[in-house]
Structures are given as C-alpha cells and as structure tokens.
Amino acid sequence: MKIFLDTANLEEIKKGVEWGIVDGVTTNPTLISKEGAEFKQRVKEICDLVKGPVSAEVVSLDYEGMVREARELAQLSEYVVIKIPMTPDGIRAVKTLSAEGIKTNVTLVFSPAQAILAAKAGATYVSPFIGRMDDLSNDGMRMLGEIVEIYDNYGFETEIIAASIRHPMHVVEAALMGVDIVTMPFAVLEKLFKHPMTDLGIERFMNDWKKYLENLKK
C-alpha cells in the first residue's frame, strides 16, 4: 500500500519524505489557498520535493475548461496528476486526457457506481471519500470495500486512493481491504506512529539505561 499526504504544506511534505514513507501528495484549491501560495508554483515545489504522483485539481467545471487546464498543469512536471471532479463533463475530460497520456485522479467519489464510471473512462486513480460518507451517517468503509471488490472482479487498472481519512483506523481498514493508496492529512500520519505501550516501553528502557550508567559510576 502506498501512502500519500493530503496537504499543500511544504514542511509537512519534507518531514514525510525524510521519514521515507511518503509516496505522493494530493492537493486541492482549498489546501493551497490555506498556504497563501501561488497555485502553479506550489504544485511545482511539491513535485520537486516528493518525486512521486502529485494530484493538482482543475477549477473549471466544463469539459473544454477542464481539458485546457489539465494540459497546462501537466506541463509543470512529469509527476503531476490531474484531479477531475466526478461529473459527466469530468468523465468526458478523463477519457480525452487518458488518451493523451495525461494521468488523472477522479475526485469527489461517493458511490461504487461513480467509481465504475471513472475506471471505464480510463482514470489513473479514483478517490472515494471515506470520512465525508461517514459524516452523512453512511458507511464509508463499506463503500470502499465494494469498490475494491468490483475493481478486482473486472481487473480495472485504475488505482484506488482512499481519501477523506480521519483517523488511523481508516488507514488500517483500508489496508485490510487491499486498497492501493491511502491519502491522509499530516496529523493522521503522525498518529500512525503512536501507541501508549510504545511510549511506556521507551520510558522504561531509558530509565533502565540511566540506572545502568549510574551503577557504573559507583
């Protein structure tokens, strides 16, 4: 399973890359606007850091606008993946871009039916939103599992990115299902390191080592 960071913050990305566990990044206009950065420049900076897939989202909603934006963004770096919303015009744009060899990520997916359309259009990635489904009192993980099963049934090449991840259990459950990729906020990535028994174990080892050094001085 690959791990992507869902952020536009360069410091967070640097840390993830230094840890050696981040394979890519997903962004959107909201994340980049929070950083106060110029959109295309920030996308280029992220690509220079991560050296892996970096999803950058179009803001047009019509077919022609999406394709035009996508072609421009694709020129920024070989690592750029174009995020396209799950709409009829979006799926049409994905079909066109896929034929041109431009990688795409269909976003705002909330049902297996939508995921089927993304795969049929030749999307490189599809991003079902788990946490947002949970917010609607629906089972986001069940939706994700159904998408995994459908893709396995038909051998679709589109990779599944579990998105809208809220906590470590989302990550674990997605991994158990065999999801290709999980994209998560930096705060969730940090939580993956944590377990109270680990902290207690480290504290105990350090105390024992301190006592050992004190005994050597006697």
Curated annotation (Swiss-Prot):
* Enzyme Commission no: 2.2.1.2
Where, by residue number, is the active site? 83
A Gene Ontology molecular function term for this protein is: transaldolase activity
UniProt GO BP: carbohydrate metabolic process; pentose-phosphate shunt
Q: Which residues form the signal peptide?
A: none
Family annotation (InterPro entries): Aldolase_TIM, TAL/FSA, Transaldolase_3B, Transaldolase_3B/F6P_aldolase, Transaldolase_AS, TSA/FSA_arc/bac
User: Looking at its record, which EC class is this enzyme?
Assistant: transferase
Q: In which pathway does it act?
A: Carbohydrate degradation; pentose phosphate pathway; D-glyceraldehyde 3-phosphate and beta-D-fructose 6-phosphate from D-ribose 5-phosphate and D-xylulose 5-phosphate (non-oxidative stage): step 2/3
Q: Cellular component GO terms, alphabetically?
A: cytoplasm
Q: Which UniProt keywords apply?
A: Cytoplasm, Pentose shunt, Schiff base, Transferase
- Please report a single Pfam family linked to this protein: TAL_FSA
Q: Where in the cell is it found?
A: Cytoplasm
Reaction catalysis annotation:
D-sedoheptulose 7-phosphate + D-glyceraldehyde 3-phosphate = D-erythrose 4-phosphate + beta-D-fructose 6-phosphate
Instruction: Identify the main location.
Output: cytoplasm
Q: HAMAP family of this UniProt entry? A: Transaldolase_3b
Q: Which NCBIfam families match?
A: fsa_talC_mipB
The entry assigns this protein to a family as follows: Belongs to the transaldolase family. Type 3B subfamily.
What is the stated purpose of this protein? Transaldolase is important for the balance of metabolites in the pentose-phosphate pathway.
Name of protein: Probable transaldolase
Species, as recorded? Thermotoga petrophila (strain ATCC BAA-488 / DSM 13995 / JCM 10881 / RKU-1)
